[in-house]
Amino acid sequence: MVSLKVCFLLLASSELAFGAAPGARSRRRGTAPANPYDKDTTSYCTWWLDYNEELPCDQVLQANSITLEKFRRWVSGGQSNTPINQWENHKANHKAKNPSITGNCEGMTVGKSYCVEAAFEPTPTASPTGPSGPTGTPGTIETPLPTQPEIAPNCDAFHLVKQGEDCGTISATYGITSAQFLAWNPSAGKDCTGLWANAYACVSIVGHEPPKTTSQAPQPTPTKPSNGIETPLPTQPKIVDNCDKFHLVQSGEGCAAITSKYGISLAQFTQWNPAAGSNCEGLWANAYACVSIIGHEPMPTPTKPSNGIETPLPTQPEIVDNCNKFYLVQSGDTCTTIVSKYGITLSDFTKWNPKAGNTCAGLWANAYSCVSIIGYTPKPSPTPTPTKPPNGIQTPTPIQNGMVTNCNKFHFVENGNTCPVIQAKYKVTLADLVRWNPAIKADCTGLWAKTYLCVGTL
């Protein structure tokens, strides 16, 4: 059963989400309704919605993370209705009966209150569910509440997710693969950020054969495919079939640290672990990643190509082959700070490190970037010095390419600044900012931190 403290934490976050909805004057009030309500409302209600303004029913369901079936059950007396003593006097003053919610989510009336949570109601029994194939006749399966959103309808085993648990540890506990866990709990997401604490996850479906259990807690059972390589569990989702070496990802580890340890490139790692994603956002902690495949020969660290230049590892993806100078990107570095340090242009930097992208969004921390190539003569590292154009206005540096020459007011962009924030501060429009600073683009995705932005002209 969800503790009252956790329940209220969940309610608080849900109330914020609902309060942010357009025109949301209807709000989750608390443990007592302010408006009249249906006399058949469940006595187990722990949170109410005071419906003071018309809102789509589906928006109400989404904001409160409930299903239509639960909503109808709670407001129409689907459970026992023994009165709760603390609400007796309140109920006597609200005798008007609200209409029942229909099967197509209609029937809500402005000025009424509706139950949107019954945290302690008895666990209902799910209807028997059967698999799509001929795997026998299943019996009645009880589904505990609350569950993760969108669990498999034919689930027959459940795990109550505890605070701090992740998809990898749960998969390991039950001897299932990451792919199976995701298929049965799709709302968890490939990066497991959608997994809810204090809610039940599906860890088996009808017809699934779980690993044999002992008197002790189940342990991950390595699998031995036809190639003879034992695969430990759980693995990252969708790793390659011909993997012959594995690494258990620790909490806080990134792709760059792993590739450096095993002398492989970032491109190889993401090819063998595609669910990790090009920016490593899908890497799971406490799950095994593939760090070698059959026939792979690991690179020595560092490498010395035919040009005689040692290349440290790991590098940014797809850096040029003729690089002769490298910089280890630190957390918080931007393309602007790096090019300023080495006296190179942004054009050169993105040419040598193409995966960084024009907006620098693809730059990886803790990986080496190329800051010079064979035959390139760098400019002396300049000291930022204000320039004085013919209009007499000094322009601070650094600035983004293409800024207008008649600017007379500048704003230094800090981390976290956005175009709307800057617009409000200087009372200018987005069209003005884009016209004066074309590099930021019409949707402001090209705005760079630690550079000066034009916010006024002559």
Swiss-Prot record:
Q: What this chain does, per the record?
A: Might have a role in sequestration of chitin oligosaccharides (breakdown products of fungal cell walls that are released during invasion and act as triggers of host immunity) to dampen host defense.
- Point to the regions of Polar residues compositional bias: 212-229
Question: What is the protein name for this chain?
Answer: LysM domain-containing protein ARB_05157
Per the record's keyword annotation, is Transport included, yes or no?
no
Q: Which residues are the signal sequence here?
A: 1-19
Query: Its domain of life?
Result: Eukaryota
Disordered as annotated region, ranges: 210-232
Q: Give compartment(s).
A: Secreted
